[in-house]
């Protein structure tokens, strides 16, 4: 039994701390749990890793994080050793349990390999990490986060020097380097104190935060909105990283807002929600309650790493309405098309193949092109780089995917809920000032361009059994579905 060999190896490895070995010893006799923790190595995919926290090869822990980091370090050094050591890497983390520990372990491994590691003093959003890569001019970046996944999860995403998540050719090459590491003893690691003493672990100061927020603020379209001070907004970061920066942005622009006090402080236990996911209506419960109490017309919610945003708005019957990710994307696009000055003639909107086809009629109505990528915002970030390098003809205007991810501006190369929240607040206040609303503007879109309906169903399959079920489902799909699905031809 291969999983039992791995279990025994971890029990006896000098690289594993005694307290973690105690956890492993407590599993003795529980073969099912041992198998689930060790039956495979947690997969380092093309963007990073994500999984349930715990000790084992199929869990997120500091040893798995170290292995991933050693693989990335090996790739950086093989790609260009001089450049890797000169430019280094930037590291951020969210509010989740273990995130700070994993971020420091990442820095310690990089430092042990002679690569400078710039690290934020405490939690920061994913889009600020994306911004930080180009701001500091590093070769790569890492953010420790599991985004909007359940509380027991954590993870780790890798970015390249353009500030976007890694894509080809880097992604598969990094995966290959990680997979070459067979033992924990191959991983280089030094103490945090030694890394700081050698100048290889460097703490970032607050200037990067200020400059990131300044970059966001350049994306505002209307600062002088009549009656803005009377338009009430409720905001919640759902216990995540968005609270501090979003309060600052809304305050600086003079919005009348209140935060959900029970959810404003970072807390990796997410005590007030089942899932800290703005795609879930239940996540808005406290926000909507506060909005009803103070007479607010919109609630904005970010996920824990502040790269996604969901909203609740009042409809024509004064009931709460929850626009989905596609609807918010289309509303933002229409607002930009109608209010942004000097849109280039080669402007492009970028979205994914699973997002709404309604974009194909809205964007061309203003002579703006549409480009579609595979699922994942990393491909949208890749297109920005290709525009800048003149590999493709186009100027980036806006990017979005149906899963509540949007990017306005090119300060970051990943979805950014902070800049999006700022523009949504502006959009909502502006529509209110002209006697309209977000809901009413959505209905206008449908009347002008036609009605579209999309939906998502999420299915959770856990553990080894879940992985096997998923594999069987996909195998059946590939084997039995060839040219047609549900009466539709597959292109």
Q: Residues of each region from the PLM?
A:
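Conserved phosphate/anionic-ligand binding catalytic regions in large, soluble enzymes, centered on
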Residues: 38-58, 146-147, 237-245, 304, ...
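Short acidic, glycine/serine/threonine-rich loops at helix termini
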Residues: 100-105, 130-134, 152-158, 197, ...
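Phosphate-binding and adjacent anionic-ligand microenvironments
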Residues: 292, 297-298, 321, 339, ...
